[in-house]
A protein has these predicted regions:
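Extracytoplasmic ligand-binding site segments that recognize negatively charged/polar headgroups
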Residues: 1-131
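A bilobed periplasmic-binding-protein/Venus flytrap-type ligand-binding module shared by bacterial periplasmic
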Residues: 45-52, 86-88, 164-177, 195-196
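Short amphipathic alpha-helical coupling segments at ligand-binding clamshell hinges
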Residues: 59, 103, 107, 138, ...
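Short, hydrophobic alpha-helical packing/hinge segments within bilobed ligand-binding/sensory domains
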Residues: 60, 123-126, 142, 180, ...
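Bilobed periplasmic-binding protein-like "clamshell/Venus-flytrap" ligand-binding domains
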Residues: 73-74, 189-196
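Periplasmic-binding protein-like
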Residues: 101-110, 148-172
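Generic hydrophobic alpha-helical scaffold/packing signal
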Residues: 124, 128, 146, 171, ...
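A ligand-binding cleft/hinge motif common to bilobed small-molecule-binding domains
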Residues: 128, 134-151
Length: 196
């Protein structure tokens, strides 16, 4: 708290190129859009191989299906791995209810023997190489993966997921806010901003 400097948007006119939806979403954590510039957004979902998975993939429960034992990759992140277990149980991913968290933990412990690996960035590469059938990944991994393997598809399950946004900010201990603003101005050029 109180660690960021307000951004001087007069020095970053290209910030106007950032999509309005990102600015609106950013208000969930920066209500006045004073401290951050949204850059990139995405979701958490399931990347799966349509040749290896012979059923409709539209629910988190496929990550817990013993039929795919040894073919499941989960994120090596406590927060992200809890999302499927919480959502398929009907709970908020932001719950702080101990009973709900305990239930999700139990589901994940039961899933453990079915999981091939807990990975971060390399899950995409394992899926491209067809070393697994199903993986929990960020949406940003999907276009790259599907470009290299036509049998891969990405879905956000019907129970819902999280939507996230990465943003830029300037910390109070920044020694050169002028250069930070120049960097933001370049990063918000129209062709770059539209790509996000």
């Amino acid at each position: 708290e109180d660690e960021l400097l307000p951004i001087n948007f007069d020095n970053i006119p290209n910030a106007a190129n950032v999509d309005e939806h990102l600015w609106e979403f950013s208000k969930t954590f920066d209500p006045e859009n004073k401290y951050t510039i949204p850059h990139y957004w995405g979701t958490l979902g399931i990347l799966y191989n349509t040749r290896l998975v012979d059923e409709k993939v539209d629910s988190w429960d496929i990550l817990f299906n013993s039929k795919y034992s040894g073919q499941i990759i989960m994120e090596n992140s406590v927060r992200d791995s809890f999302v499927p277990a919480l959502k398929m149980s009907g709970y908020s991913i932001n719950t702080d209810n101990t009973d709900e968290l305990d239930e999700a933990e139990k589901i994940l412990i039961e899933q453990r023997p079915m999981v091939q690996a807990y990975l971060l960035d390399s899950a995409r590469d394992e899926m491209i190489a067809e070393n697994a059938a199903i993986a929990l990944v960020y949406s940003g991994e999907a276009p790259y993966a599907t470009e290299y393997n036509d049998d891969l598809a990405y879905v956000v399950p019907k129970e819902g997921s999280n939507v996230w946004v990465d943003s830029w900010a300037v910390t109070k201990d920044c020694k050169n806010t002028e250069n930070a603003e120049k960097a933001f101005e370049i990063l918000c050029e129209k062709w770059k901003a539209m790509g996000n």
